[in-house]
Design a protein with these regions (language model features):
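Glycine/charged-rich beta-loop-alpha catalytic/anionic-binding loops adjacent to active sites
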Residues: 23-31, 71-83, 104-106, 153-160
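Catalytic cores of large soluble enzymes that bind and process phosphate-bearing ligands
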Residues: 34-38, 82-85, 165, 169
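Conserved active-site and cofactor/substrate-binding residues in soluble primary-metabolism enzymes
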Residues: 40-45, 57, 88-92, 121, ...
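Structural motif
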Residues: 59-62, 104-107, 132-136, 175, ...
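Thiamine diphosphate
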Residues: 66-142
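Glycine-rich, charge-decorated loop segments at or immediately adjacent to ligand/cofactor-binding or catalytic sites
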Residues: 144-149
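Conserved thiamine diphosphate
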Residues: 150-185
Length: 185
């Protein structure tokens, strides 16, 4: 947890969208992820898209699992609803949020370890049910939070920091989602 806070003063020249909000109104907390981590780019893209489309932040539900990627929902849409679920179980929790309030726009954030390992069954069934949600998988082929073990999506033959090769074929979540009937991949 960081104790660094973002200033709440808005620059007078920041563009304002149809809701009277600036891009800063769609941001969240200061990131605590490693410098250069691609997960921050995902958060920045969500902030930009929601601001440009004038989507009201309070109409979003963000749910994540466990891992580096699951820290990212706190970095975007600060005025939205959020929940960190247990490892691999984000799809069930966001399905519940979706069923409880059909007016919410649901974003599920998960990592490759969270979705392709312990949560693979959950991933398959939420896609098969065609739950109305955006399911983001931040896939870097590694368990970054625990410092570098291969995830189930890592390419065969890749080597770890210690030079050990990955002996297994990767699970291709994109192909699996398409095979299960996902409409937007």
């Amino acid at each position: 947890m960081t104790f660094v806070t973002k200033p709440r003063v808005h620059h007078p020249n920041l563009p304002i969208n149809e809701l009277g909000l600036t891009r800063r109104d769609y941001e969240g907390s200061v990131s605590t992820l490693c410098a250069g981590c691609g997960h921050d780019s995902v958060s920045a893209a969500i902030v930009q898209a929601c601001a440009e489309l004038s989507l009201p932040p309070h109409r979003f539900a963000k749910v994540s699992g466990i891992g580096c990627s699951s820290k990212t929902p706190s970095y975007f849409l600060n005025r939205s609803h959020g929940f960190n679920s247990v490892h691999g179980r984000m799809p069930s929790v966001i399905t519940g949020a979706n069923l409880a309030n059909r007016d919410l726009m649901c974003i599920g954030v998960s990592g490759d370890g969270d979705s392709a390992s312990i949560g693979l069954g959950q991933f398959a069934h939420v896609v098969r049910r065609r739950t109305n949600m955006l399911y983001l998988v931040d896939n870097n082929g590694t368990y970054g939070l625990t410092k570098g073990q291969f995830s189930a999506t890592n390419d065969k033959g890749s080597t770890s920091k210690k030079g050990v090769p990955n002996l297994y074929e990767p699970i291709d979540l994109v192909s699996l989602a398409l095979q299960l009937g996902a409409s937007f991949v």
